[in-house]
């Protein structure tokens, strides 16, 4: 269980670092670029740091399924996911606010939706035989991300 948690935590830390990098890479443009450009670039930067190979995608999915099956792993897994989700939600909601935007739903729910879209599109791409560098995950993630934003009141 400790090994599974370590791998899942490392994956979450990698995703967090990718998101931080995407936001940092956009910080100079946040007040001048269009929403579509910012979302597109943020998603592109995030995806460029992700591992898309079959082995890694399958291993990550199997680890999550293992957490679902093993009651002893669940409390730590749930706590780790909650912690990482809070960090992601804070990071992306603050970045959105810098652009004069906010989410149409609570940021934690937005993170959950974005994660589900990314995971589903990536896994379905592998099942359907799409190339690892297929634009589909990024296009779908950007479209959903944009659809969850609205101007600040």
Spell out what each predicted region is.
Residues 6, 13, 17-55, 107-114:
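Hydrophobic alpha-helical connector segments
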Residues 74-75, 95-153:
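Hydrophobic/aromatic-rich alpha-helical bundle segments in the mid-to-C-terminal region
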Residues 36-43, 85, 89, 135-146:
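Hydrophobic core segments within long, regular secondary-structure runs in both alpha-
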Residues 26, 64-68, 121, 125-129:
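Secondary-structure edge/capping motif, primarily at the C-terminal ends of alpha-helices
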Residues 16, 51-61, 71-98, 109, ...:
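Amphipathic alpha-helical packing segments from all-alpha helical-bundle domains
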Residues 44-51, 58-69, 148:
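Helix-loop "lid/cap" segments that line or gate small-molecule binding pockets
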Residues 1-4:
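Short amphipathic alpha-helical segment with a characteristic S/N-K-E followed by hydrophobic residues
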């Amino acid at each position: 269980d400790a090994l599974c948690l370590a791998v899942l935590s490392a994956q979450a830390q990698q995703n967090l670092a990718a998101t931080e990098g995407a936001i940092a890479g956009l910080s100079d443009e946040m007040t001048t670029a269009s929403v579509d450009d910012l979302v597109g670039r943020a998603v592109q930067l995030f995806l460029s740091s992700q591992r898309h190979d079959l082995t890694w995608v399958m291993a990550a999915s199997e680890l999550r399924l293992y957490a679902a099956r093993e009651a002893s792993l669940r409390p730590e897994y749930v706590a780790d996911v909650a912690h990482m989700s809070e960090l992601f939600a804070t990071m992306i909601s603050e970045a959105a606010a810098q652009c004069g935007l906010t989410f149409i739903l609570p940021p934690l729910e937005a993170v959950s939706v974005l994660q589900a879209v990314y995971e589903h599109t990536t896994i379905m791409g592998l099942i359907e035989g799409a190339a690892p560098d297929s634009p589909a995950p990024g296009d779908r993630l950007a479209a959903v991300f944009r659809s969850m934003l609205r101007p600040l009141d």
